[in-house]
Amino acid sequence: MVTIIRNADVYAPEHLGRTDVLLLGGTIAAVGENLKADFGGAVKVTELDGSELILTPGLIDGHEHIMGGGGEGGFHTRTPEASLTDLTLNGITTVVGCIGTDGVARHMESLLAKAKGLEEEGITTYVYTGSYQVPVHTLTGSMMKDIMMLDNVIGAGEIAISDHRSSQPSFEEFARIAADARVGGMLSGKAGVVNVHLGDSPRMMDLILRVVRETEIPYSQFLPTHVNRNEALFCQAIQFALEGGTIDMTGNEDIDYWETICDEVRVSTGIRRLLDAGVSDDNFTISSDGQGSLPIFNAKGEYQGIGIGKASSLLKEVRECVQRENIPLEIAIKPVTSNPARILKLSSKGRIQPGMDGDLCLLRKDDLTIHTVIAKGQIMVRDGKPLVYGTFEKRG
C-alpha cells in the first residue's frame, strides 16, 4: 500500500508550505518536493491531488466515551456507542476512551473490547483505566498494574473531583491515585497521566493544586479536563497553565445555546485568552467528550435534561479558532494533534514527518472541512464520504 499526496499545503503542524508526502504501508516515509515511488508496476501507487487542499496530521481525541456514557437521568439516558465513521468523518484517527459517571454498568472489560474493535476497523485507540469513582475501578484489580501491563491503557481517568457526582475523594486518596498512575507510567514507558473531570464546585482544582504543592508529584501528572465549563474555573486554569500545567478544554457543537444558560467559555475564545495571557501553545489540548452525556442540573443538583457530546466538535473548534479569533492554523491544530501526542506520550502520532504513523487529514482550504482522512495509511474518507465503515454501519 503506497500513497503519494501531491502538492498539498502542509501543516505538520508547523507550516511547511506546498510539498509532497509519501506513505509506505501505515508509515510516513518521506516529505518533500517531487517525490517518486517506482516499483516497476509491482506495487500499486495511489496518488492524491492536494493542490487545493490543506494537509494536517490526523486528529487525536484525548477524551471520548467510545462505548457510551451518561445515565444521570435513569437507564433510558444511557448514551450510545461511537461508530467508526462518527470518528473518521470528523478527522479523528486516534481516540482515547474513558468511563464517566456510570462505573457500574460501564466497566473496563467493555471499554477495552470497544477500543479493540475500533482498532480492528482501522483507527488507533487507547483508554484510561477507571471512571468517576474512587476507589478506582480497574480490570486487573490494580490501577498501576492496568497501566503497566495492558497495552491500550495509558493512564487513569476520568477521575471526578469538585462535582456532586464524584466519590468526594479525600486528599490522601487522590494523591495515591496520582502516585500509582505515575509509577505505572514510568515502569511501562507510558504517560501515566490522571485525566481529571472537573465539575462546577467552587473548589475547582483545589485537590490537584494541593497534591502538586504538598507532595513530590509534578503538574505534568495531571490533565484536568472540562476547564472551560465556567468562567471561574477557566480563570484558575489559565494560572495553572502559566505555572506549567497542561489543561484540556471540551469542545461543544452547541455552544451558542449553552452560552445562553451558563457561563461556559467558548473554546476559541478560551484559546485566544490563553495565548494573550502568555500561556505556551504547548500547554493545552481540546477533546470532544464525544458520546458523553451533557446533563443539566438546577442549583439544587436536580436533573433537568440531557444532551450528548459530539466528536464533530473537535474540528469545529479548530475552525472557530481560525475563523472567529484569527489564530494561525499551525497553532489552532496543535491542541488536537502534536500537543495530545506529546502529553500522552503517543510517540508516533500528531506530526507529519518521516517515521510517524500515516494518520492524515486533507481539509478544504475555503472552510476547513474534511475532504480526505487517512488512518494508518488506509484511506478512510474521500471527498467527504466514508470508504471504510464500521462492521455494522449502514453503507451509502
Locate each region found by the language model.
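Active-site gating loops and adjacent loop-to-helix segments of metal-dependent hydrolytic enzymes
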Residues: G70, G74-T77, E81-G97, D146-S167, ...
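C-terminal cap of metal-dependent C-N hydrolases
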Residues: G25-I28, I352-G396
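Metal-associated gating/positioning segment near the N- to mid-region
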Residues: A42-V45, G50-A113
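Divalent metal-coordination and catalytic microenvironments
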Residues: A8, G26, E52, H63, ...
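Divalent metal-dependent hydrolysis catalytic cores, especially in the metallo-beta-lactamase
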Residues: A82-P135, D151-H164, M186-S201, S220-T225
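Histidine-rich, glycine-flanked metal-binding segment
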Residues: M1-T3, V10-T56
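His/Asp/Glu-enriched, well-ordered alpha-helical/loop segment
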Residues: D276-L362
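Active-site core of metal-dependent hydrolases
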Residues: A179-P295, Y303-Q304
